[in-house]
A protein has these predicted regions:
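Bacterial N-terminal signal peptides
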Residues: 6-16
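Boundary at the C-terminal end of the N-terminal hydrophobic targeting segment
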Residues: 18-21
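Basic- and aromatic-lined ligand-binding clefts that recognize polyanionic substrates
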Residues: 24-37, 131-187
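Proline-aspartate-enriched helix->loop->beta-strand connector
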Residues: 70-88, 102, 201-215
């Protein structure tokens, strides 16, 4: 387990000798895809990104979009040879770019680790990093499976969980999503698994009385959510001090690496021992 995690870290920080790839001018229209380019040692090829991407502010990188709204004119001016986006990006803008002869690749939001890995490898293939992408994807799957097996072996399955994404309105992770898969992969029961939508009432959570609550947010934004739950001392997760935090910039930007690392943190918070 530690060897696999070390491999992931080494790959991310460049301890592997990565194969050279043809230089490209890439525009990324999704934070998760930008993060993937960093993991594939292709950050230097990014010429444009969204204001929410980790490359925003980097020298030589132009911010040409928000989370969903893009500026086709600004993108064209960058003369990219590859534009990568998700289905969250306004499709009419992407069609405009395609009609101008630009290469645009759209990825839908992955709902499982396998889908996330497949997209990661596809991206790697497009930028000449298929071998590196495959290695990272396979290592992430090994980590995830190892955590699953050890959670079961240590008798840590069967607990109920709320994974909270927002507080106003209160929103929980449902089934059919990669975050929902993370919950069940660790052998836990998602109290929102069968809900048609993630918007919750506080009363629903109190009735469900989860053993654990994982709060996803950015930095200090998580503290008010934690304090609000602490105002319900009879709630099992509060009574047992089972309120845990997850960083939104990592969990909400799905890549094989962020999935595996977030899963490992959750497993340890759930009591997994090395």
């Amino acid at each position: 387990m530690r060897r696999i995690l070390s491999l992931l870290v080494c790959l991310v920080v460049g301890c592997f000798s990565l194969m050279a790839s043809t230089p490209r001018r890439i525009v990324s229209l999704a934070p998760s895809l930008t993060r993937s380019l960093y993991y594939l040692d292709a950050a230097d090829e990014i010429v444009g990104c969204t204001s929410y991407c980790m490359a925003a502010g980097r020298k030589g990188v132009t911010v040409i979009a928000s989370a969903v709204k893009t500026s086709p004119e600004a993108i064209v001016a960058l003369k990219p040879d590859l534009i990568i986006a998700t289905t969250l990006t306004r499709q009419s803008d992407l069609e405009t770019l395609r009609k101008l002869g630009l290469e645009v690749v759209t990825y839908r939001s992955g709902t499982t680790l396998d889908e996330i890995c497949d997209q990661f490898v596809d991206l790697g293939k497009r930028i000449g990093k298929e071998a590196e992408a495959t290695t990272l994807a396979e290592a992430s799957k090994v980590v995830a499976e190892d955590l699953k097996q050890r959670m079961s072996a240590q008798g840590l399955t069967g607990r109920t969980m709320l994974m909270q994404l927002g507080d106003d309105p209160l929103y929980g992770v449902t089934g059919g999503s990669y975050m929902g898969e993370m919950i069940t992969r660790l052998g836990c029961i998602n109290i929102c698994e069968d809900l048609g939508q993630g918007t919750l009432s506080r009363e629903y959570v109190l009735r469900s009385d989860p053993d654990y609550i994982f709060i996803i947010g950015m930095g200090e934004d998580r503290q008010p959510m934690i304090k609000r739950w602490q105002s319900f001392p009879d709630l099992k997760a509060v009574r047992l001090d089972h309120l845990y935090e997850l960083e939104a910039n990592e969990v909400s930007q799905p890549t094989p690496i962020t999935y595996a690392l977030a899963l490992r943190k959750m497993a340890h918070d759930l009591g997994l021992k090395e």
